Amino acid sequence: MADESETAVKLPAPSLPLMMEGNGNGHEHCSDCENEEDISHNRGGLSPANDTGAKKKKKKQKKKKEKGNDMDSTQDQPVKMNSLPAERIQEIQKAIELFSVGQGPAKTMEEASKRSYQFWDTQPVPKLGEVVNTHGPVEPDKDNIRQEPYTLPQGFTWDALDLGDRGVLKELYTLLNENYVEDDDNMFRFDYSPEFLLWALRPPGWLPQWHCGVRVVSSRKLVGFISAIPANIHIYDTEKKMVEINFLCVHKKLRSKRVAPVLIREITRRVHLEGIFQAVYTAGVVLPKPVGTCRYWHRSLNPRKLIEVKFSHLSRNMTMQRTMKLYRLPETPKTAGLRPMEKKDIPVVHQLLSRYLKQFNLTPVMNQEEVEHWFYPQENIIDTFVVENANGEVTDFLSFYTLPSTIMNHPTHKSLKAAYSFYNVHTQTPLLDLMSDALVLAKMKGFDVFNALDLMENKTFLEKLKFGIGDGNLQYYLYNWKCPSMGAEKVGLVLQ
């Protein structure tokens, strides 16, 4: 949601989810853009827990450098470089690499406090060290909104993707599958299915122009994407129409072309044209200024496989057999009346959700149509189970969505099936029992791991149900809205 007067090359990317995990970064570093592409990474859901950050960063920068120069070496390197001695070229390249490592995205508030954020200092967001006690927009809504699309580098063109066309949907799936978020060690990459993308990108009120693609003019190949979806957001005592920004992705070979900043700038312009001037997004990196910070936790369902693919490791003094026994679950759920959600449950699920979310400070506000879209079960996308008591009343529900990851370069295992905790509402069944049953159901459905953020009331069950803490944070951000920050337990919003 960048200011219209800024130049395109300075624009950073909102978060994805923005898919962002430490969605591992995989993007080229852009020091003058303040890591504009890194915002869209690091969700925290991919990374194996408890690895050291320093090792990851060096490894990642090395890999980036190896694959960096594909398309632009002739255009971007000064001609005089060829006349320098090989030793001198190596010295320069090493200095550039060391500089890049030192200037990588900040993963903690401490790291961020040592950075300058020249771009973000021009944007309608609070400064990192600012103490905010007020509520409201940082700047007023705009009247003069640019009517023409922003200019892409030569040879590229905009295309609003028609995801109702299976061929186009497959193109988007392929772009994300081959270029989207990886963990820091390049071991796992999110694998969004075409059906999941339709669920995530076409909720009630979706607009085709907000499925913003970039194609090569000559070949029509899809090489970039960013999306926005509408969302009514309740922030403290205010309800505001916003967008959620997601799925920023640029083809690996084009990351030196500065396509990502223009993508972000263009989606901002298109959102402004619809009269919306606030956005919510998440990122695994620290930018000015998080409204909340959450941490991913992981519960092993298939510990042998997770250890074999190095998602997790055997603890000291633990054998594989003891580990499998530690994480063993009951064969069936124990809550009486637990069953899959049906169409007839939509009104009561809507009512339960709306009441439950009132205790939190950052939440979605959904109507019945949106509840149907986000919660009605779809195989391999979203699972929702309700608890019906002896009187036929639905009193509780649990939900989790499906997001597998491709396992890179493993001889046996090709995919990691992960369940992500969505919204879980309890009025009669203890939350601990509800979530214990969620683990059992996920195990029965063949999931390898169950992931949950420490938001809402989740901290009350994570350790008791043998979740292990992940190695990265997920920051929540609001664009053009100022309010006090909140603890994770007051965040009541889950983005895909």
UniProtKB/Swiss-Prot annotation:
Tetradecanoyl-CoA binds at Q118, F119, W120, F247, L248, C249, V250, S256, R258, V259, A260. Gene3D superfamilies: 3.40.630.170. Residues 55-66 have a biased composition (Basic residues). It is found in: Cytoplasm; Cytoplasm, Cytosol; Membrane. GO terms for molecular function: glycylpeptide N-tetradecanoyltransferase activity; myristoyltransferase activity; peptidyl-lysine N6-myristoyltransferase activity. Pfam families: NMT, NMT_C. The modification Phosphoserine is found at S31, S47, S83. GO terms for cellular component: cytoplasm; cytosol; plasma membrane. Signal peptide: none annotated. InterPro entries: Acyl_CoA_acyltransferase, NMT, NMT_C, NMT_CS, NMT_N. Residues 1-81 are annotated as: Disordered. GO terms for biological process: in utero embryonic development; ketone metabolic process; N-terminal peptidyl-glycine N-myristoylation; protein localization to membrane. Its EC number is 2.3.1.97. It is a peripheral membrane protein. Its main location: cytoplasm. Belongs to the NMT family. Adds a myristoyl group to the N-terminal glycine residue of certain cellular and viral proteins. Also able to mediate N-terminal lysine myristoylation of proteins: catalyzes myristoylation of ARF6 on both 'Gly-2' and 'Lys-3'. Lysine myristoylation is required to maintain ARF6 on membranes during the GTPase cycle. This is Glycylpeptide N-tetradecanoyltransferase 1. It comes from Rattus norvegicus (Rat). The gene is Nmt1.
